[in-house]
Swiss-Prot record:
Subcellular location: Cytoplasm
GO molecular function, one term: NAD binding
Organism per entry: Colwellia psychrerythraea (strain 34H / ATCC BAA-681)
EC number(s) on file: 1.1.1.290
Task performed by this protein: Catalyzes the oxidation of erythronate-4-phosphate to 3-hydroxy-2-oxo-4-phosphonooxybutanoate.
Keywords attached to this entry: Cytoplasm, NAD, Oxidoreductase, Pyridoxine biosynthesis
Class of enzymatic activity (EC top level): oxidoreductase
Pfam families named in the record: 2-Hacid_dh, 2-Hacid_dh_C, DUF3410
Subunit structure: Homodimer.
InterPro entries: D-isomer_2-hydroxyacid_DH, D-isomer_2_OHA_DH_cat_dom, D-isomer_DH_NAD-bd, Erythronate-4-P_DHase, Erythronate-4-P_DHase_dimer, NAD(P)-bd_dom_sf, PdxB_dimer_sf
Pathway recorded for this protein: Cofactor biosynthesis; pyridoxine 5'-phosphate biosynthesis; pyridoxine 5'-phosphate from D-erythrose 4-phosphate: step 2/5
Catalysed reactions listed for this entry: 4-phospho-D-erythronate + NAD(+) = (R)-3-hydroxy-2-oxo-4-phosphooxybutanoate + NADH + H(+)
This protein's encoding gene: pdxB
Protein name as annotated: Erythronate-4-phosphate dehydrogenase
């Protein structure tokens, strides 16, 4: 069995090397092989003999890519979105598809939290006094909501699809008991954080959801964070707003037209990064693990490995806290694990030297809060660090 995988999938060799040799030797002809590829430049000829194709979001999987292949049976995307996959084409050919929903949700939520502590320090903001508006109540929005709840930060969630599903839920109490608000309510919050997929058309499109009309509703003192899909914000409308002197503070991890970036917008951002919010080691590796589990199910075999088998220890595996929790301690804890200013500096210095894709491909190892054990020296201290996701003994 030949398994082709994106070269940027962590631990792909560890997870899949044994699977590609299954059923070898039956006819003595085909040899199992695990083949890495560059996701942006993949061609139909390269994958003409693939039995399994494992991609990330930069690879378009459609008839154009697979028309030379008459044997492929499984396509996996080690990412949360599916807008790069022609699902109807795969269904027509009876090709099994699996994505990795929620694999990097924690990573993105921790990116947002790092951005918030950086901006709070920069502008002397008290985080507990802010209200955060979350657009999108799926996996990532939920993880962010959990962390904000742990910090006692008020927040609102806008998700019309989940709101409709909630109304149709006949169970008592409803499975989802969250209160959803209209977009206009979220746009009035002190912080607006976007966590929706790209949806073109339909009843609730998200393509250019934050357009000139909605941008005009923003106040000068607000913070706008986008760590979902680049097309959710109209970048040219945002640039027009900023060049007109509007004071809204911008954090952009995603950009319209990636890997091309609207260069003129960069100086107007507080934090700018190369679509790496979900790029923690755990976040990327969970995608590999989820596809491994799905392929094992497809092959009717029991999974042999899990992510914990491969994750290394963090550079600072454990710390002890001998004070109660406050915003200063939050700042220190978050930055100890992930300081988003590092990625912002690399982006500004290296974007036009290395290129957008190269920044992503060569992204340094970054860990999640769970990689660090926090020991509290007194049982009277708040367990907020643990509720934020830090490990405990």
């Amino acid at each position: 069995m030949k398994i082709y995988f994106d070269e940027n999938m962590p631990f792909a060799k560890e997870f899949f090397s044994e699977l590609c040799h299954l059923n070898n030797g039956i006819d003595g002809e085909e040899q199992g092989e695990l083949v890495p590829f560059s996701g942006r430049t993949l061609t139909a000829a390269q994958v003409a003999d693939a039995d399994v194709l494992l991609v990330r979001s930069i690879t378009q999987v459609n008839e154009q890519l697979l028309h030379l292949n008459d044997k492929i049976s499984f396509v996996g995307s080690a990412t949360i979105g599916t807008d790069h996959i022609d699902l109807s084409y795969l269904a027509k050919r009876n090709i099994t598809f699996q994505s990795a929903p929620g694999c990097n949700a924690i990573s993105v939520a921790e990116y947002v939290l790092s951005a918030l502590v950086v901006l709070a320090e920069r502008y002397l903001l008290t985080l507990s006094s802010l209200t955060v508006g979350i657009v999108g109540g799926g996996n990532t929005g939920t993880r962010l909501s959990e962390k904000l709840t742990a910090l006692g930060i008020q927040h609102k969630i806008c998700d019309p699809l989940l709101a409709e599903k909630q109304k149709q839920d006949k169970s008592h109490p409803p499975t989802d008991q969250r209160h959803y608000v209209p977009l206009v309510d979220v746009l009035a919050c002190d912080v607006i954080s976007l966590h929706v997929p790209k949806v073109v058309g339909g009843e609730h499109p998200t393509n250019k959801l934050i357009n000139a009309e909605n941008l005009a509703l923003l106040r000068e003192d607000q913070i706008l964070i986008s760590a979902c899909r680049g097309d959710v914000i109209d970048n040219h409308a945002l640039l027009a707003l900023k060049t007109a002197g509007h004071g809204v503070k911008i954090v952009l991890d995603v950009w319209q037209g990636e890997p091309d970036v609207l260069e003129a917008l960069i100086p107007y951002t507080e934090i700018a990064t190369a679509h790496i919010a979900g790029y923690s080691l755990e976040g990327k590796a969970r995608g590999s693990e989820m596809l491994y589990q799905a392929l094992c199910q497809q092959l009717a075999i029991t999974p042999k490995y899990q992510l914990a088998n491969f994750l290394p220890s963090a550079s600072i595996p454990a710390i002890e806290i001998n004070q109660d929790f406050n915003q200063i301690l939050l700042n220190q804890l978050v930055k100890m694990v992930y300081d988003v200013r590092r990625d912002d500096a690399i982006f500004r210095q290296q974007l036009f030297v290395q290129g957008f894709d190269s920044l992503r491909k060569n992204y340094p190892v970054r860990r999640e809060f769970s990689a660090v054990t926090v020991n509290l020296s007194s049982t009277t201290y708040s367990d907020v660090p643990h509720r934020l996701g830090f490990n405990k003994n």
